Design a protein with these regions (language model features):
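N-terminal membrane-targeting hydrophobic helices
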Residues: 1-143
Length: 143
C-alpha cells in the first residue's frame, strides 16, 4: 500500500487506542503487515515509481505534520503514523537504487503473500482506508 495510507492508518490506530506508546508501537507495525495482505495497487508497477514514491512520502509528511501541529495530537501519538509507514522506506530506496526486488521488511519480500489488484480497485481500497482513518483521527479528538 502507499506510505500515506499506512501513515493515516497508524495515526488512526494511535488515536483510537490512546496509549501507552509501547503498546501502540507494535500494533501499528503489525498493521502495516496486515494492510499489505489486502489486495491493492502500488505505484511500484507504474512507469514512474520514483516520482509517485516521492509524492507519496511528501503527502505522508504533510499528514503527520497536520496531525501533530494542526490537530494538536501529542508527539508520541502523531509519530505512530510515520512508524506505521516506515517499512515502505525500503521500497523507495530499492526503486532509487534500481533494485526493486531488494527489500528488508518481511511483507515486501517476494515470498510474502502481498495483496495485489487492478488499478481502479486497488486505489479505491486505499481511498476507503484513508477516509476511514481520517474519520477516526477526527472523532478521537481531543487527544
Amino acid at each position: 500500500m502507499w506510505v500515506s495510507t499506512h501513515v493515516l492508518a497508524g495515526l488512526a490506530i494511535a488515536a483510537a487506542i490512546g496509549g501507552p506508546w509501547w503498546l501502540v508501537l507494535p500494533i501499528v507495525v503489525l498493521a502495516h503487515v496486515v494492510m499489505d495482505l489486502i489486495p491493492h495497487w502500488d505505484y511500484t508497477v507504474s512507469k514512474h515509481p520514483v516520482v509517485y514514491g516521492c509524492c507519496d512520502f511528501a503527502a505522508s509528511l504533510a499528514a503527520w505534520l497536520l496531525a501533530w501541529f494542526a490537530l494538536g495530537m501529542p508527539f508520541w501519538m502523531a509519530f505512530m503514523g510515520p512508524i506505521s509507514g516506515a517499512p515502505d522506506w525500503d521500497v523507495l530506496i530499492a526503486e532509487l537504487r534500481k533494485r526493486p526486488d531488494v527489500h528488508w521488511f518481511p511483507s515486501h519480500w517476494k515470498s510474502f503473500p502481498h495483496g495485489r489488484s487492478g488499478r481502479a480497485w486497488g486505489i479505491g481500497v486505499q481511498a476507503v482506508i484513508m477516509a476511514a482513518s481520517v474519520v477516526v483521527v477526527l472523532a478521537a479528538r481531543p487527544y
